[in-house]
From Swiss-Prot:
This protein's GO CC annotations: chloroplast; mitochondrial large ribosomal subunit
Protein's recorded name: Large ribosomal subunit protein uL2c
Gene this protein is translated from: rpl2
Region (Disordered): 24-57, 226-266
Species of provenance: Zygnema circumcarinatum
Family the entry assigns: Belongs to the universal ribosomal protein uL2 family.
InterPro entries: NA-bd_OB-fold, Rib_uL2_dom2, Ribosomal_uL2, Ribosomal_uL2_bac/org-type, Ribosomal_uL2_C, Ribosomal_uL2_CS, Ribosomal_uL2_dom3, Ribosomal_uL2_RNA-bd_dom
């Protein structure tokens, strides 16, 4: 995927860069695999904001992605590679031998006409899905299950890639994109290869309006709020936060404070925390 940079025609294009969308071959999605999407704008069932800075954005259709890859033993052919407004990764439409069509995440290097397979003993090639127990050490994978049959939950973003570094007993040891080293059951399914659109992180938004198109509202610093609205607020003029450490709007320590519960069931499966934790 290429990145297109703009010249400074306006202040908004001065540092703007976007994807060239050169791998996309179809503009309209498969109708039977889409549905309308009610955007909650960060509100819960009572209308109270539970996730700040969300709202607006362009209207979208939701594409139903096959994260389970449960068409076992049936060859599928790549029909098209499409844009998905709900994620950074591209998606590709698969047509199976029985006529069924499904969307999957687009693996890097896969092109139209290629065949993929989901099976216990599928070949080790990009796009194929099989259990971790049948993959050799050093295999690069994505769309990894954490519970057998639940569907892929890890390494699904654009450019995401994980690696099998060891196997022992019923667990495989994986190095995840975040740098975390974790144990996963060998019966869990994963897809070979790396998620496509690897340059997604190299794009520069360029202007605030681009974030609004994506449904992201402005973030206001706590230090410029009133004391009633944020622990950092108040004071005369440009004042410091007046605290020993930064706090969230609800008074909890932040910016470096670990927030993960020590009593999570999966704590014993994490051998090394992620890099920024």
């Amino acid at each position: 995927m290429g990145i297109r940079s703009y010249k400074a025609y306006t202040p908004g294009t001065r540092n703007r860069s976007v994807s060239q969308f050169e791998e996309i071959v179809q503009s309209k999605p498969e109708k039977q695999l889409t549905s309308g999407q009610h955007r909650k704008k960060g509100r819960n069932n009572r209308g109270v904001i539970t996730s700040r800075h969300r709202g607006g954005g362009h209207k979208r259709l939701y594409r139903h992605i096959d994260f389970k890859r449960d068409k076992y033993g049936m060859l599928g052919r790549i029909v098209s590679i499409e844009y998905d407004p709900n994620r950074n990764a591209r998606i590709c439409l698969i047509s199976y031998q029985d006529g069924e069509k499904r969307y999957i995440l687009h693996p890097r290097g896969i092109s139209i006409g290629d065949q993929i397979l989901s099976d216990t003993h599928a070949p080790i090639s990009p796009g194929n899905a099989l259990p971790l127990t049948n993959m050799p050490l050093g295999t690069t994978i994505h769309n990894i299950e954490l519970q057998p049959g639940k569907g892929g939950q890890v390494a699904r973003a654009a450019g995401a890639i994980a690696k099998i570094i060891a196997k022992e007993g019923k667990f495989a040891t994986l190095r995840l994109p975040s740098g975390e080293v974790r144990l996963v059951l060998q019966q869990c399914l994963a897809t070979i290869g790396q998620v496509g659109n690897v340059d997604a992180n190299n794009q520069s938004i360029g202007k605030a309006g681009s974030k609004r198109w994506l449904g992201r509202r402005p973030t206001v610093r706590g230090v410029v709020m009133n004391a009633a609205d944020h622990p950092h607020g108040g004071g005369e003029g440009r004042a410091p936060i007046g605290r020993k450490r930064p706090l969230t709007p609800w008074g909890r320590p932040t910016l470096g404070r670990k927030s993960r519960s020590r009593h999570k069931y999966s704590e014993a499966l994490i051998l090394r925390r992620r890099k920024n934790a």
